[in-house]
From Swiss-Prot:
Molecular-function annotations in GO: ATP binding; metal ion binding; methionine-tRNA ligase activity; tRNA binding
Subunit organization: Homodimer.
Cofactor binding note: Binds 1 zinc ion per subunit.
Primary gene name: metG
Keyword Cytoplasm: yes
Name of the protein described by the UniProt record: Methionine--tRNA ligase
'KMSKS' region, short sequence motif: residues: 330-334
Gene Ontology biological process: methionyl-tRNA aminoacylation
């Protein structure tokens, strides 16, 4: 068994204020680090800010400051928020530290020496006005997939990953002029050459038991599709300079330098850093990330280390989490939607309450919506009504009727057998980084304690059988001590407070669990928490919901919206041509049951060959406002399903319906007896707010099935049974 835990949380970008969803990784890693220390494992928890790259450079332009000044300001903001949340880093550093440049350049030179670096020419936007190549976020335009405004790396509206040259009507963000396409030269890491070593490492690291399901699926899909050489340089000023002739004016891509930041930040506090990072036999590297960062930690960072041919500590356990969202809305600081780290501090609600709720709902296997009403309910019922109630009622009752002194108890099986089994279960959940399950197991133990107190009715027996009643209460007091230890990774301030009740006579250590050690007196007691009041929660909900118009717009009932505003129809694909100005765009001529038919433009070339689609019946948004894509008119949008691993499939009607009829409308099952009007034209934004999903192979809006208007057959998604539909 490895003796040391080296724990990292994904380095947050330092160009914004973190919201609740951004805090999941640092909080998760903090809980695991505290558990690790509790188990007397040598532990180092490393994190810091990711400061280089386009996001920082463009944010500095917008705020009319320098990247250095921007990073200094946001680093201080991040640090203060994490301190308020009581996150116990061993170091919270920065990728602009002195050792980072040397560490990144040194690894690059080793990769080059070992033959893993190539160079290639590529086409990139160049701004003639500003005389510079434009990295992805320096370009804005229309998304070729949904027509919305998008940056050159990804469309925030439909989540489509993009390259800048995919954008329609591209513009430079600095001068707003139209850039030209120009050839530039970049360095690449040769991932195909490292593939065999990468796969061998994955097999020996037992990733199937040490990584969660989403990480395994995402990584295996990436490897199955074939590794490609990946650019590691960019035409920017704010970054680590490339130590190679002819590339002096370029910097390393932030995805290349950021993971190396874990190493360089460790160097800042430990001369003995190699005992952590070059000690694969004794050190277990545990990394906490969001699902959007999986491949950088399972493929890219390991490939960099393997390619250097040095004895690096490799990834052991990977804990990737899903997204924490806000009241079915998008977090937006400018619109006042959602609660951000600096807002949390001003609510008057303690850090441990926030920590408890985030762990209780940690998005381990699926996304989670933060809801104010649920927040109040869980805190009042679980943290206060269950855990805090046990601590308060037992200690105050004992102190009142039996005094301050705590006697040593005899550990009896009838009281402790079930509880000790639950201790083992809790510690195993911690070990497997199933933090939500660990917390809920602790709350189950607390419930057992409350039930024992209630069932035994010590208020009735204290006079008739005082010795037996005292023994019962003493067992419950030792149970409370154990709960304060087990729950300390989640709510450390509260755990310390309980320890102070007992004069801090024991440590946060697993060696005390289930024993009669470490308790002498109850020095004082007080209520741990007060209940959250509805008036406070309602005021916070209103405060962080955005302006009224925006709130009404974003929370419009999806069912009413679909019934009144959306018209989906079955169409047959008659012909497909490629757009001469954009090879990825198909021009589809459709039979929609009308004499003239329809034409739509869709970016399907990466997913389908023309012959696979011609003659098939698909579903389109029939009443979408017309748009032009690279000069070609589009009169609608086909709908497709995408799963969490970005697998994408067009919904083919033949998969579930014989002899489809072009022009037949798709409606909600609840509207099957209604006479529906044809709605007016709508924007893509309005359509996406209907939130159509595939659930167990069936298309639904808010749980209601979509069906064919005449045959009443359900609309199915055979190839991707669960995912979002757009």
């Amino acid at each position: 068994m490895k003796k040391k835990n080296l724990i990292t949380a994904a380095l947050p970008y330092v160009n914004n204020i973190p919201h609740l969803g951004n805090l999941v990784q640092v909080l998760s890693a903090d809980a695991f680090a505290r558990y690790s220390r509790m188990m007397d494992i040598d532990t180092l928890y490393v994190c810091g800010t990711d400061e280089y790259g386009t996001a920082t450079e463009t944010k500095a332009l917008i705020e009319k400051t320098t990247p250095e000044e921007l990073c200094n300001r946001y680093y201080a903001i991040h640090k203060s928020i994490y301190e308020w949340f009581n996150i116990k880093f061993d170091i919270f550093g920065r990728t602009t530290n002195k050792s980072h440049k040397q560490t990144v350049q040194d690894l690059f030179l080793k990769l080059e020496k070992n033959g893993y670096i190539t160079d290639k020419e590529s086409e990139q936007f160049f701004c003639q006005q500003d005389q510079m190549f434009l990295a992805d976020r320096y370009v804005t335009g229309e998304c070729p997939n949904c027509g919305n405004n998008a940056k050159g790396d990804q469309c925030e509206n439909c989540s489509k990953l993009l390259a800048p040259i995919d954008l329609i009507n591209p513009k430079c963000i600095i001068c707003k002029n139209i850039p030209i396409i120009k050839t530039t030269k970049h360095l690449y890491i040769n991932l195909p050459k490292i593939k065999n070593e990468l796969i061998h490492w994955m097999q020996t690291t037992e990733h199937n038991t040490n990584w969660n399901t989403n990480a395994i699926k995402t990584t295996n899909a990436f490897l199955r599709d074939g590794l490609k050489e990946r650019a590691i340089t960019r035409d920017l000023k704010w970054g680590i300079p490339v130590p190679k002739k002819e590339y002096e004016n370029k910097v390393f891509y932030v995805w290349f330098d950021a993971p190396i930041g874990y190493i360089s930040i460790t160097k800042e506090i430990s001369k003995d850093w190699e005992s952590w990072w070059k000690n694969n036999k004794e050190t277990n590297l545990v990394q906490f990330i969001g699902k959007d960062n999986i491949l950088f930690h399972t493929v890219i960072f390991p490939a960099i280390k393997l390619g250097s041919k040095e004895n690096w500590t490799m990834l052991g356990k990977l804990a990737s989490s899903e997204y924490l969202n806000y009241e079915h809305l998008k977090f937006s600081k400018s619109a006042g939607i959602g609660i951000f780290g600096n807002d949390v501090i001003t609510t008057g609600i303690s850090a441990d309450i926030w920590r408890f709720y985030i762990y209780y709902n940690r998005p381990e296997k699926s996304d989670f919506q933060f809801m104010w009403d649920d927040f109040m309910e869980r805190i009042n019922s679980e943290l206060i009504g269950n855990f805090s109630n046990l601590v308060n009622r037992v200690l105050t009752f004992y102190k009142k009727f039996f005094g301050d002194k705590i006697d040593t108890i005899e550990i009896k099986e009838d009281f402790w057998k079930e509880i000790n089994l639950k201790y083992d279960k809790t510690l195993n959940f911690f070990k497997q980084i199933e933090l939500k399950s660990a917390l809920k197991e602790i709350l189950d133990i607390s419930r057992i304690g409350n039930k024992i107190f209630q069932d035994k009715e010590p208020w009735k027996t204290k006079d008739s059988t005082p010795k037996k009643t005292k023994e019962l209460l003493l067992n419950l007091i030792y149970l409370i001590r154990d709960l304060s230890i087990l729950i300390s990774p989640f709510i450390p301030h509260t755990s310390d407070k309980i320890r102070r009740f007992f004069g801090e006579s024991y440590e946060i250590s697993n060696k005390f669990l289930g024993t009669n050690l470490g308790l002498n007196t109850i020095q004082f007691t007080e209520v741990l928490f007060t209940k959250l009041e509805k008036e406070l929660i309602d005021s916070l909900k209103l405060k962080y919901s955005g302006g009224k118009n925006m709130q009404d717009e974003q929370t419009e009932n999806p069912i009413n919206l679909f019934s009144e505003k959306v018209c989906l129809k079955v169409v047959q694909i008659k012909t497909i041509e490629r757009n001469p100005d954009a090879e990825k765009l198909f021009i589809l001529k459709l039979d929609d049951g009308t004499p003239d038919g329809k034409q739509i433009v869709s970016s399907l070339a990466d997913y389908y060959k023309e012959e696979k689609l011609i003659g098939k019946h698909i579903i389109i948004v029939d009443n979408l406002k017309p748009a032009k894509f690279r000069g070609i008119k589009s009169e609608g949008m086909l709908i497709a399903t995408e799963d969490e691993n970005k697998n994408f499939k067009v919904i083919i009607v033949e998969d579930f319906k014989d002899n489809p009829i072009p022009g037949e409308r798709i409606i909600l099952e609840s509207d099957s007896d209604k006479k529906l009007k044809l709605p007016s034209k709508i924007s893509i934004d309005k359509f996406l707010k209907t939130q159509i999903v595939a659930e167990n192979g069936e298309l639904k809006v808010n749980g209601i099935n979509l069906i064919l208007e005449h045959s009443k057959e359900k609309i199915l998604s055979r190839e991707i049974p669960n995912g979002k539909v757009y």
